[in-house]
Amino acid sequence: MASRYQDVLAANPIAQALSPGFAPGQNFLRWRLLDPAAREIYVDWEDAVDAAVSGLRELAGTVPDDPRMQTLIAELSSASPHFRDTWARANVGYRLGVMHLRHPLVGDLYLCRNQLIVPHVPNAVGQHLLIYRAESGSDSARALEKLRSLSAPAG
């Protein structure tokens, strides 16, 4: 679950094991842009960033004069030429499709990405649930299962 600013509000254990960018409290766009580890995990890093920036642009439109959003956009524009260029292209909307990740423990994963928007309710405007899933029976599904077992608490 993420805010309109792409701050991670909650994540299940497998999401957290999949990427440090999904840790609660983390801004996953900032992490993708600025942490070198993101380039190792996202095989097509530019596509992963472009998808997140297009999603942010859509979410920014939900409250156009939001000072926190404007601060985030200014911060990312200053810190990342790639963000600045992608933002200037003005693509809007979360992109569905397959994302290729490379995890250091389980290898390559091809995950379908989806998004569910929380209906407009006070204090939740722009909150959304990100869903990454593997095709049933695929190598990616087996890799996710292995990751789940590796990240499960002992006991």
Language model: regions and residue ranges:
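Hydrophobic protein-protein interaction segments
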Residues: 1-155
